[in-house]
């Protein structure tokens, strides 16, 4: 079975000490590195919150969150050991930026102009085999934060063979993460 790993928002601003820290983020991201080195994954999709400096989700603009993941800042960068593991293992990697102007929790509601909407390619009759999910493909979703962007990405793909890797994910609210998984019938596994 082919396995695609979707790594959601593994960015410095979501790690402990970041601008919007998720407890357990460093451990989850280090587990992702180990999984990338395991040889079990053939394709990786990385997503990044990629906000402008006056993003609608920021408290200063009337939003819910502190400023975080501003484009072209260190806080918006993906955790370097993950990028190193992708390169070391020569994994096919697609990168998605989300939320430049609008609030986008799911990687697959990406409306950020200038960036390809990967999901449209993945679910069509694309002739490029790397841009198409197959019936026998397992999609493993992980990253930060489990109860927000990871869960919304899983919900967008819930009709596919998709699971969330619990040991590769950290949540702001673990109870909410579990309730949402039950509500939307999303399978949570250890990998």
Question: Could you describe each region identified by the protein language model?
Answer:
Residues 48:
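Catalytic-core segment of enzymes that process non-peptidic bonds
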Residues 23:
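Substrate/cofactor-recognition hotspot
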Residues 2-6, 11-13, 18, 27-43, ...:
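Active-site-adjacent betaalpha module
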